[in-house]
């Protein structure tokens, strides 16, 4: 899927679709961007390979939906056009549903192989929609802003045999919490000094997550100075309490 770090091997992955060549289309993930839009076969092959090797697996499904290009199937586009939405909005909504369908296909791949109950699924996204359909730039209070549309997104965990009871948690968490939490679920040791909080026990026992606040930074889309990252800094923000 979407992968900005060059070859998948640079991220420690053994398998992947992204070549990372410095060529047209390589910025977001070249061949990896086909996943979801053109089927799920590479994922099926990878899961089957892990089964054949009798090894656990980590799968990154960074599907390039509902990101542009907004080219949903006509059956989905018609559904939202018929509701009276502007064409740009109808395309976006249709791509959201298309993405949702591929998530269902991914779950079916696990179910078909009797892996679903023992597989931890983590859903995370980066930012909300650029909400002004008439503008190609960044809409106020949306992507790349310190406001809710830019930084408040859902994180979901599902692990049927992992003791995670259904719950809607209001506490503050951050994507930096995913690494220590996933390591704990896998029974692996977390390196010292890693930022983030291991949420596994909180999720299993419904213990409150005691955190006063979370912090973050927002940077400009284009880097101003490779040797001075702070030159592109736009915002520093802190969230605390009920938000």
Q: Where do the PLM segments sit?
A:
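Short, solvent-exposed turn/loop segments enriched in Gly/Ser/Thr/Pro and often Arg
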Residues: 1-10, 62-68, 123-129, 195-197, ...
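Loop/turn elements at helix/coil->beta-strand transitions in domains of secreted/extracellular proteins
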Residues: 53-59, 115-121, 153, 210-211, ...
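Catalytic-site neighborhoods of secreted/periplasmic enzymes
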Residues: 1-44, 139-142, 212-215
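A long, amphipathic alpha-helix that forms part
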Residues: 40-48, 78-119, 162
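C-terminal cap/loop subdomain of S1 sulfatases and analogous C-terminal strand-loop tails that border
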Residues: 129-135, 163, 171, 176-179, ...
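Beta-strand elements within well-structured catalytic alpha/beta cores of enzymes
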Residues: 57-62, 96-99, 103-106, 110, ...
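Histidine-centered active-site microenvironments of extracellular/periplasmic hydrolases
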Residues: 11, 109-167, 174, 195, ...
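Active-site His/acidic residue clusters
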Residues: 43-92, 127-140
